[in-house]
């Protein structure tokens, strides 16, 4: 039955490889298209008329002309940038706490850029009407402001009055992080009823700089009717538009690996929302937007509605805070924690907790690995004992196989009777591997998708735990003046992982079958090349886990 154990282990390893291959190379199934049968055609036509121009790239606009438009400066601990008073558009935003790369003079990460720039990306909220006679603020409106600077300590109040005397007031606040709150108020001083709808949109010119991988979602995203909706850029490009009619919209936005721009509408109403793609004059634009039902404002009445814009880094604790504070459903799922969300997030919490004490995520990984190892010690102990018993039973198993080679039913019956007599579980040796698979994936996800791990250093030459080991043995770890091709980037940590894996195998019971024993000996070498490009933080975890397993195996061999 030793053959069965080895086959099971090999199957697990193969499954691990297939899962990673699937994550990287197989496009996820097309999501089930939402049925839109209750949309009001009038509202849809209105939205197309009012928002169509916002999807199209700006034409005939000169940068110098844009620079002459007055702006409100944004200044906080986390953000710098400005809001255009023309159209009240959030189109200039820089994240002060994050650099684009690790170089000394690296610029800060820019999130939003004006519509006439190469990387156009902006957000806005406003009002539209189904009556052309109603004069509302639009993209050409120049707003009046009581301040030139928006900060957490100082909100900005804006106003505009149309020719009928209707006053439009907007108050914008920003917190110390990445959340803007926009309150719009209409004071109907006219003698007519005003039908209005509030809307919000995020528009982006997107050019892929690297091949998309299925292990990470990037593109339109949102929580609609308490369900997470994710569409890649390619999905929306193929569909042209994905519509959701009269829904509860907690938030919609566009997500990158580490950054998120999101609209959070007022909870007083349901909204129609869309994920759109448009190609105009060779420029690809993606847009997410929402629009409310018609609200009738009678003469002499006021109407107010509040919306929020999140634009910044996807910090776990920050998204959790906003989700709880403003009841924003599934807001933390903007971070793609993946299949093992129920494990991945607690693993991150554990790492972040110890980081608060040791100040280094690499050390935090070592501590969490020790805790996981202690939790599984009893299971691993039983596993090693079972493997040893299986090795001792191998001669008797071979005898039974020879005796009943022509009768498979009797063969299986006799082998199971032997296991029962000797009190051996043939799959017990594989249980620790099965348990560690979701833990492995969870740690990988934490390293790959969380902003906290981005550019997080360890010691020595490791400056970014989320990136692969930058060294390689093929240029003697930097001593020789050339850079090998990417498939030969076999760094120090991948080598250490392979060595510790080899030593762990040496201390474990060897398969009785010589051929299988030879195959298992090649596994460290296979894994060396297979995982050399993975985040070095994962290799630190794996190497340290192997070292702890060696210590554990030594303890079991000595005292049992």
From Swiss-Prot:
UniProt GO MF annotations: membrane insertase activity
Major localization listed first in the record, in broad terms: membrane
Pfam families named in the record: 60KD_IMP (PF02096), YidC_periplas (PF14849)
GO cellular component: plasma membrane
Alphabetic keyword roster: Cell inner membrane, Cell membrane, Chaperone, Membrane, Protein transport, Transmembrane, Transmembrane helix, Transport
Topology term for the membrane: Multi-pass membrane protein
Transmembrane stretches, start-end: 5-25, 334-354, 357-377, 431-451, 476-496, 522-542
Biological processes annotated in GO: protein insertion into membrane; protein transport
Keyword match Nucleus: no
Subcellular location, record wording: Cell inner membrane
Subunit-structure text: Interacts with the Sec translocase complex via SecD. Specifically interacts with transmembrane segments of nascent integral membrane proteins during membrane integration.
Record-stated family: Belongs to the OXA1/ALB3/YidC family. Type 1 subfamily.
Function noted in UniProt: Required for the insertion and/or proper folding and/or complex formation of integral membrane proteins into the membrane. Involved in integration of membrane proteins that insert both dependently and independently of the Sec translocase complex, as well as at least some lipoproteins. Aids folding of multispanning membrane proteins.
Official protein name in the record: Membrane protein insertase YidC
């Amino acid at each position: 039955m030793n053959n069965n154990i080895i086959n099971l282990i090999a199957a697990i390893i193969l499954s691990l490889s297939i899962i990673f291959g699937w994550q990287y190379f197989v496009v996820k199934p097309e999501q089930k298209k939402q049925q839109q049968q209750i949309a009001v055609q009038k509202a849809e036509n209105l939205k197309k008329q009012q928002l169509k121009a916002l999807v199209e790239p700006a034409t005939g606009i000169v940068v110098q002309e844009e620079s002459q438009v007055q702006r409100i400066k944004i200044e906080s601990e986390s953000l710098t940038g400005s809001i255009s008073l023309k159209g009240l558009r959030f189109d200039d935003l820089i994240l002060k706490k994050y650099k684009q790369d690790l170089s000394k003079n690296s610029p800060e990460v820019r999130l939003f850029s004006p519509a006439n720039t190469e990387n156009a990306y902006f957000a806005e909220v406003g009002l539209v009407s189904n009556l052309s006679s109603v004069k509302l603020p639009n993209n050409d409106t120049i707003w009046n402001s009581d301040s030139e600077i928006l900060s957490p300590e100082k909100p900005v109040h804006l106003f505009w009055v149309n020719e009928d005397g209707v006053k439009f007031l907007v108050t914008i606040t920003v917190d110390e992080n990445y959340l803007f709150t926009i309150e719009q108020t209409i004071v109907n001083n006219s003698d007519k009823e005003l039908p209005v709808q509030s809307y919000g949109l995020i528009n982006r010119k997107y050019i892929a700089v690297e091949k998309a991988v299925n292990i990470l979602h990037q593109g339109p995203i949102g929580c609609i009717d308490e369900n997470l909706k994710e569409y890649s850029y390619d999905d929306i490009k193929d569909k042209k538009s994905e519509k959701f009619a009269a829904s509860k919209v907690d938030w919609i936005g566009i997500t990158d690996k580490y950054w998120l721009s999101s609209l959070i509408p007022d909870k007083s109403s349901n909204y129609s929302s869309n994920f759109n793609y448009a190609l105009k004059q060779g420029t690809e634009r993606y847009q997410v937007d929402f629009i409310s039902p018609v609200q009738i404002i009678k003469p002499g009445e006021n109407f107010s509605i509040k919306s929020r814009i999140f634009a910044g880094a996807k910090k776990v604790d920050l998204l959790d805070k906003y989700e709880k504070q403003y009841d924003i459903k599934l807001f933390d799922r903007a971070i793609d924690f993946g299949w093992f969300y129920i494990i991945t997030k607690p693993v991150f919490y554990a790492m972040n907790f110890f980081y608060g004490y040791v100040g280094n995520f690499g050390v935090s990984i070592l501590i969490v690995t020790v805790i996981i190892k202690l939790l599984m010690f009893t299971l691993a102990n039983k596993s090693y004992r079972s493997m040893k018993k299986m090795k001792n039973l191998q001669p008797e198993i071979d005898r039974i196989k020879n005796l009943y080679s022509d009768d498979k039913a009797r063969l299986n019956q006799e082998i199971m009777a032997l296991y029962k007599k000797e009190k051996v579980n043939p799959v017990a040796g594989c249980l620790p591997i099965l348990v560690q698979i979701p833990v492995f994936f969870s740690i990988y996800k934490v390293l790959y998708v969380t902003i906290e791990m981005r550019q997080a250093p360890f010691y020595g030459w490791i400056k970014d735990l989320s990136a692969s080991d930058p060294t390689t043995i093929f240029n003697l770890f930097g001593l020789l003046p050339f850079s090998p091709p990417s498939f030969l980037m076999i760094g120090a940590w991948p080598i250490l992982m392979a060595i510790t894996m080899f030593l762990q195998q040496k201390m474990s019971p060897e398969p009785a079958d010589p051929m299988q024993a030879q195959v298992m000996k090649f596994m460290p070498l296979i894994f060396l090349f297979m995982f050399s490009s993975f985040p070095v933080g994962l290799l630190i975890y794996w190497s340290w886990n192997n070292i702890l397993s060696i210590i554990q195996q030594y303890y079991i061999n000595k005292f049992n």
